[in-house]
């Protein structure tokens, strides 16, 4: 095929929706470049959810999961599924035992903090209640710092989740101590004021006080404030973290816990840090945080990035802040350091309260740099992520989502033009999961802010090429076939190319 370079363009949250549905921001926007490539290049559809990406059946996919499946070239059993299978038998876990023994010896309180949600993207409330119950059985007082979702779930599902969670906490000495919307507790874009506001409620009980979590949520709903944006609050007579206490970070996904964990450990410029005795996380978060964890990470051999390195080729990863970790850490399946020959470019995301206020985000700045790198012809593989469809889709604002679609489409046209002008270069356009193609939940009569179960597109800018439907783990083998590189045995995905006659970039 004589392809020397592949540009893998991941349109984050761009799923295959119902055409001409009034809540499909893609079809509403009628993006011209998208219509062109969909009509003129080989295409197929990929499954991006459930068992096809290593999640429980019927579970929506997400960006972490999607990028790991794409980058590894295999179905990766995800943290949610793994913990579901193993959490019932974690009593013998060495790090958990050490954590419990430290609390017992000092008569400390266990502070469990995490997203109390059934969304399954960053955490699951059943994991948190199981941990609370197992720890309280040792005579340890447990307090919960509940983060509310409304982003990977319906915007006003928090009340129901908290009610169910409260019933599931069996320990007599277990209760909810603080409540915070994830907008504050789980920021990942260096909006430190948000993180500090959540931290001060958790560490020092410095926040408005309410009698119980349900009434707090109801009061916010009455003021049109949904789960994600509920300001940190103290519940009852909670007094804060004490030196003899322990902290357990219950989210299994790392990216939205790094800032809070960094403040807890005194690794930021924030001066007033509460002392505590021990800390533990559900999964490994980040090497330099040095937090013990319950479930060790899975190692991956012969990923796409590794294979490109092994063939002594160069690769580029480029994204704006919101998705930078996905094209680097997650795409490389948990490897923090770049591969040899891997260049990384971070484009700062705009500093706005929510991205419906600036739907184009930093897509144009990103594209300018990307086009420059495509023309350089330095790289065998370029991986780029456009965050707009997902980040604006999460706001539930359909008009803004349509603007986001058009902004990305404008960028896509520039990328396609650059690829056409570069010899022996192919463009792949795909997505990691759906979102922006469904902006309203008609059944519940509420904006749809979560991901979808829809398949995602896969388009290759090659003539005379036939594709078959597949799943995200088939993308890496397809890229290797285009580049004429043998697929490693560890890659269990299969190329999506079903037939080649005379393929050339176009």
UniProtKB/Swiss-Prot annotation:
<comment type="subunit">
    <text>Monomer.</text>
</comment>
<feature type="binding site">
    <location>
        <position position="451"/>
    </location>
    <ligand>
        <name>Mn(2+) 1</name>
    </ligand>
</feature>
<feature type="binding site">
    <location>
        <position position="63"/>
    </location>
    <ligand>
        <name>Mn(2+) 2</name>
    </ligand>
</feature>
<dbReference type="GO" id="GO:0030145">
    <property type="term" value="F:manganese ion binding"/>
</dbReference>
<feature type="binding site">
    <location>
        <position position="390"/>
    </location>
    <ligand>
        <name>Mn(2+) 1</name>
    </ligand>
</feature>
<feature type="binding site">
    <location>
        <position position="122"/>
    </location>
    <ligand>
        <name>substrate</name>
    </ligand>
</feature>
<dbReference type="InterPro" id="IPR036646">
    <property type="entry name" value="PGAM_B_sf"/>
</dbReference>
<dbReference type="InterPro" id="IPR017850">
    <property type="entry name" value="Alkaline_phosphatase_core_sf"/>
</dbReference>
<comment type="function">
    <text>Catalyzes the interconversion of 2-phosphoglycerate and 3-phosphoglycerate.</text>
</comment>
<keyword id="KW-0413">Isomerase</keyword>
<comment type="pathway">
    <text>Carbohydrate degradation; glycolysis; pyruvate from D-glyceraldehyde 3-phosphate: step 3/5.</text>
</comment>
<dbReference type="GO" id="GO:0006096">
    <property type="term" value="P:glycolytic process"/>
</dbReference>
<dbReference type="GO" id="GO:0005829">
    <property type="term" value="C:cytosol"/>
</dbReference>
<dbReference type="InterPro" id="IPR006124">
    <property type="entry name" value="Metalloenzyme"/>
</dbReference>
<feature type="binding site">
    <location>
        <begin position="253"/>
        <end position="256"/>
    </location>
    <ligand>
        <name>substrate</name>
    </ligand>
</feature>
<comment type="similarity">
    <text>Belongs to the BPG-independent phosphoglycerate mutase family.</text>
</comment>
<feature type="binding site">
    <location>
        <position position="394"/>
    </location>
    <ligand>
        <name>Mn(2+) 1</name>
    </ligand>
</feature>
<dbReference type="GO" id="GO:0004619">
    <property type="term" value="F:phosphoglycerate mutase activity"/>
</dbReference>
<dbReference type="InterPro" id="IPR011258">
    <property type="entry name" value="BPG-indep_PGM_N"/>
</dbReference>
<dbReference type="GO" id="GO:0006007">
    <property type="term" value="P:glucose catabolic process"/>
</dbReference>
<feature type="binding site">
    <location>
        <position position="182"/>
    </location>
    <ligand>
        <name>substrate</name>
    </ligand>
</feature>
<feature type="active site" description="Phosphoserine intermediate">
    <location>
        <position position="63"/>
    </location>
</feature>
<feature type="binding site">
    <location>
        <position position="188"/>
    </location>
    <ligand>
        <name>substrate</name>
    </ligand>
</feature>
<keyword id="KW-0479">Metal-binding</keyword>
<keyword id="KW-0324">Glycolysis</keyword>
<dbReference type="Pfam" id="PF06415">
    <property type="entry name" value="iPGM_N"/>
</dbReference>
<feature type="binding site">
    <location>
        <position position="12"/>
    </location>
    <ligand>
        <name>Mn(2+) 2</name>
    </ligand>
</feature>
<feature type="binding site">
    <location>
        <position position="432"/>
    </location>
    <ligand>
        <name>Mn(2+) 2</name>
    </ligand>
</feature>
<feature type="binding site">
    <location>
        <begin position="151"/>
        <end position="152"/>
    </location>
    <ligand>
        <name>substrate</name>
    </ligand>
</feature>
<protein>
    <recommendedName>
        <fullName>2,3-bisphosphoglycerate-independent phosphoglycerate mutase</fullName>
        <ecNumber>5.4.2.12</ecNumber>
    </recommendedName>
</protein>
<keyword id="KW-0464">Manganese</keyword>
<dbReference type="InterPro" id="IPR005995">
    <property type="entry name" value="Pgm_bpd_ind"/>
</dbReference>
<feature type="binding site">
    <location>
        <position position="323"/>
    </location>
    <ligand>
        <name>substrate</name>
    </ligand>
</feature>
<dbReference type="Pfam" id="PF01676">
    <property type="entry name" value="Metalloenzyme"/>
</dbReference>
<feature type="binding site">
    <location>
        <position position="433"/>
    </location>
    <ligand>
        <name>Mn(2+) 2</name>
    </ligand>
</feature>
């Amino acid at each position: 095929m004589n392809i020397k370079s592949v540009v893998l363009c991941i349109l984050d949250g761009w799923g295959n929706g119902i055409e001409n549905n009034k809540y499909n921001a893609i079809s509403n926007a009628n993006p011209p470049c998208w219509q062109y490539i969909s009509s003129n290049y080989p295409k197929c559809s990929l499954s991006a959810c459930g068992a096809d990406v290593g999640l429980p059946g019927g579970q929506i996919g997400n960006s972490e999961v999607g990028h790991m499946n794409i980058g590894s070239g295999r179905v990766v059993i995800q943290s949610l599924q793994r913990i579901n299978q193993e959490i019932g038998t974690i009593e013998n876990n060495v790090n958990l035992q050490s954590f419990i023994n430290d609390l017992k010896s000092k008569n400390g309180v266990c502070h469990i903090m995490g997203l109390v949600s059934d969304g399954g993207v960053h955490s699951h409330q059943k994991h948190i209640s199981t941990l609370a119950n197992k720890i309280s059985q040792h005579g340890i007082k447990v307090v919960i710092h509940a983060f509310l979702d409304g982003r990977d779930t319906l915007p006003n599902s928090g009340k129901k989740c908290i009610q169910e969670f409260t019933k599931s906490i069996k320990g007599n000495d277990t209760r909810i101590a603080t409540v915070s919307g994830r907008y504050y507790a789980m920021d990942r874009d260096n909006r430190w004021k948000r993180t500090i506001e959540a931290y001060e409620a958790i560490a020092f009980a410095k926040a408005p006080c309410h009698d119980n979590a349900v009434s707090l949520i109801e009061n916010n709903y009455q003021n049109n404030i949904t789960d994600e944006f509920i300001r940190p609050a103290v519940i009852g007579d909670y007094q804060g973290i004490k030196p003899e206490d322990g902290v357990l970070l219950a989210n299994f996904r790392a990216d939205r816990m790094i800032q809070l964990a960094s403040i807890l450990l005194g690794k930021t410029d924030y001066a007033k840090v509460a002392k505590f005795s021990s800390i533990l996380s559900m999964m490994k978060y980040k090497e330099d945080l040095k937090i013990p964890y319950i479930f060790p990470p899975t190692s991956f051999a012969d990923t796409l990035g590794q294979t490109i390195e092994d063939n002594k080729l160069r690769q580029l990863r480029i994204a704006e802040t919101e998705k930078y970790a996905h094209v680097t850490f997650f795409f490389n399946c948990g490897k923090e350091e770049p591969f040899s020959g891997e260049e990384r470019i971070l484009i700062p995301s705009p500093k706005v309260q929510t991205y419906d206020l600036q739907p184009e985000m930093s897509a144009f700045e990103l594209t300018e740099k990307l086009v420059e790198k495509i023309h350089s012809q330095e790289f065998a593989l370029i991986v780029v992520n456009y965050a707009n469809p997902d980040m604006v889709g999460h706001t539930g604002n359909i008009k803004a989502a349509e603007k986001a679609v058009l902004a990305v489409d404008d960028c896509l046209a520039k990328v396609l033009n650059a690829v056409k002008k570069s010899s022996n270069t192919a463009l792949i356009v795909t997505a990691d999961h759906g979102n922006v193609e469904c902006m309203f939940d008609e059944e519940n009569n509420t904006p749809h802010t979560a991901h979808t179960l829809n398949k995602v597109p896969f388009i290759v800018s090659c003539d005379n090429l036939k594709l078959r439907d597949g799943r995200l783990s088939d993308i890496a083998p397809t890229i290797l076939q285009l580049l004429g590189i043998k697929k490693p045995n560890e890659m269990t995905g299969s190329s999506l190319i079903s037939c080649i006659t005379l393929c050339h970039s176009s």
